[in-house]
Swiss-Prot record:
Disruption phenotype: Prevents the formation of normal conidiophores. The lineage of its organism: Eukaryota, Fungi, Dikarya, Ascomycota, Pezizomycotina. This is C2H2 type master regulator of conidiophore development brlA. PANTHER family: TRANSCRIPTIONAL REPRESSOR PROTEIN YY, YY2 TRANSCRIPTION FACTOR. Residues 62-72, 238-252 have a biased composition (Polar residues). Keywords: Activator, Conidiation, DNA-binding, Metal-binding, Nucleus, Repeat, Sporulation, Transcription, Transcription regulation, Zinc, Zinc-finger. It is found in: Nucleus. GO terms for cellular component: nucleus.
Length: 432
């Protein structure tokens, strides 16, 4: 190494401009931006206390770290090596084949970089080899405990998984890939970020689960001695209750533990007063009592309805009753009562015409039932009449005359004509 007496001895740059045109070789003595030059530029790590902004023509002193140059006519992309890496960790990023407009500046993602420096770009084909020597450059305090990241050998970053920087609780912005960022989070917001926003960026081991917080960390949550010690009454609490769930205070706020008493008495969540209570939430405390009272009322009314005096009359009081002593006949219509009264009278005008029967009925319908049930069946006690049997070929309900011994009609005869051989037969002889 050279003596570190002057900046020109410490930062000596050799640029091979033989393969470049006159317009493509920048002058290192003049200030230029790496954005405008296709020539690869040196890459280094700057911290807030060890290095200053790399103005190429006027930079600060580097007391412990120097840049070595490789003698010869090699190109600049292989001429720089950082001779001060204190650890054995390597830094490899899939930044090779990205277009110029797709590249993002490194200071936007690494808080260890100075925001005032000129934006440096990772060269597309630079080997990025470093010497791991004992004398090294101390890391910034916000960038400690970085694990080793494997170098991406494939130049096409689109076909490889993005290399993620290690997760850290001090700077949540470093937990995401620097190339696949849906949105940027400035590093200055890391100190003011609440615990709710910190949880997605933390490791499983570093994150604090809400159910594992010790009671001593949250603070005592003890109910008051009585309900009268509440700062507000229950009705006031229901009036100030919002219609939608309230986001509870974050764990990272400095207001202290979030307890149910603090929500009741106000505090950081006093904006709930702006909400109007909904009818469903307002009646939530009275609904169970109201439903219980309705159930009790229904039970009482059902018991009262089962009592005999409260039961409705199944048989309605009819207007037409039979006046015969000992008869409890009741009827809905007057004609029904008249028909019933004929059964009590001694007059029976309806007589069976079948020879040998001569049974009389007070009602015609009873006589017809007698014909159907008595004389139309074979083998009965009464005489069988074929003209009254619907299944017989001699069926004729209008026939009135003499019958043969087997019950078949004798056409042309009359009821008054004597039956042949009837003198030798009795009434029991008709029974078969």
């Amino acid at each position: 190494m050279r003596n570190q007496s002057s900046l020109s001895d410490r930062l000596t740059v050799e640029v091979d401009c033989s393969s470049l045109g006159s317009n493509e070789c920048p002058s290192m003595t003049s200030s230029f931006s790496p954005l405008e030059s296709p020539t690869p530029t040196p890459t280094s790590i700057y911290s807030q206390g060890s290095l200053e902004s790399p103005g190429w023509h006027g930079a600060g002193s580097l007391p412990n770290n120097t840049y070595e140059r490789t003698p010869g006519s090699a190109s600049m992309r292989s001429a720089f090596r950082l001779a001060g890496m204190a650890s054995t960790e390597s830094l490899g990023l899939p930044y090779g084949s990205m277009e110029g407009q797709e590249r993002m500046p490194m200071p936007d993602f690494l808080s260890g970089y100075d925001e005032n420096i000129e934006q440096l770009w990772m060269p597309s084909e630079a080997p990025k080899s470093y010497d791991h020597v004992a004398q090294g450059l101390a890391y910034h305090q916000g960038m400690h405990q970085y694990p080793t990241m494997a170098r991406n050998t494939n130049n096409n970053y689109r076909h490889q998984a993005a290399a993620y920087l290690p997760e850290s609780t001090t700077n949540p912005c470093l937990s995401r890939s620097i190339f696949h960022q849906p949105e940027r989070v400035p590093s200055s917001m890391s100190s003011s970020m609440s615990m709710n926003n910190m949880l997605p960026w933390m490791n499983l081991g570093d994150s604090i689960a809400p159910q594992t917080i010790a009671p001593s960390q949250v603070g005592p949550v003890t109910p008051p001695p009585s309900y009268t010690d509440f700062p507000t009454s229950l009705s006031a609490f229901k009036q100030h209750s919002p219609t939608t769930p309230i986001r509870s205070c974050s764990l990272g706020t400095g207001s202290g533990a979030d307890t149910p008493l603090s929500r009741l008495s106000g505090g950081p969540c006093e904006y709930m007063d702006d909400f109007q209570p909904s009818p469903v939430y307002r009646d939530g405390f009275q609904r169970p009592h109201r439903v219980a009272s309705r159930k009790m009322l229904r039970r009482q009314t059902s018991k009262q309805n089962l009592m005999l005096e409260n039961l409705p009359q199944v048989i309605k009081q009819v207007q037409f009753k039979c006046k015969e002593p000992g008869c409890n006949g009741r009827f809905k219509r007057q004609e029904h009562l008249k028909r019933h009264m004929k059964s009590h009278s001694k007059e029976k005008p309806h007589v069976c015409w079948v020879p040998g029967c001569h049974r009389a009925f007070s009602r015609s319908d009873n006589l017809n039932a007698h014909y159907t049930k008595t004389h139309s069946k074979r083998g009965g006690r009464n005489r069988y009449v074929a003209t009254l049997d619907e299944n017989s070929p001699d069926y004729d309900p209008e026939f009135r005359g003499q019958l043969t011994p087997d019950g078949r009609p004798i056409y042309g005869s009359k009821l008054d004509d004597p039956i042949p051989g009837a003198g030798d037969m009795s009434l029991d002889g008709w029974d078969e």
